A protein has these predicted regions:
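Class I S-adenosyl-L-methionine-dependent methyltransferase catalytic core
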Residues: 1-152
Length: 152
């Protein structure tokens, strides 16, 4: 995922649903200008802050616009329940610079559901690749998912 993001030393990066930092830890081997991470769980936020890999912000990413700041790259694994992945990715896309690149893990459902939010997401013309069944079994989930790439 981090490799697909093609991170450059001049990039400002956003991880809007950072959890305990699995994705941002994978970014350690890359050079970039800045990294901003959002987390809604106070416990996870404390873990992120301790990583000292960038700016960890506590709060609901969906209610943020970062003061209009735009990011070159966005890497994310948003929550899937109740189509939250659509909400998170669509909102993150609005914070992407032009040109910019967003790479996300999303549920399979967004690619076949006929809800308004799924249709809005698909209108962004994402590239996607199905991940092997059981990819996240060690994390306690068997949800079918895809690796998604959106360019602006």
């Amino acid at each position: 995922m981090a490799e697909m993001a093609d991170i450059k030393p001049t990039d400002d990066i956003l991880e809007p649903s950072a959890g305990r930092g699995a994705i941002v830890v994978a970014l350690r081997k890359y050079r970039f200008r800045s990294l901003t991470m959002f987390e809604l769980s106070r416990e996870n936020y404390a873990v992120l802050s301790g990583l000292k890999l960038g700016t960890a912000l506590f709060g609901d990413f969906l209610k943020e616009d970062c003061g209009g700041f735009k990011f070159d790259k966005i890497v994310m694994n948003p929550p899937f329940s109740r189509s939250q992945d659509c909400d998170h990715v669509t909102h993150a896309y609005s914070m992407l610079r032009t040109p910019g690149l967003l790479v996300a893990i999303m549920s399979e459902g967004v690619f076949f559901r006929e809800t308004a939010k799924a249709r809005i997401f698909r209108a962004l013309n994402p590239w996607s690749e199905c991940l092997p069944e059981g990819t996240f079994k060690s994390s306690g989930t068997m949800v079918r998912s895809r690796l998604v790439r959106l360019e602006k």
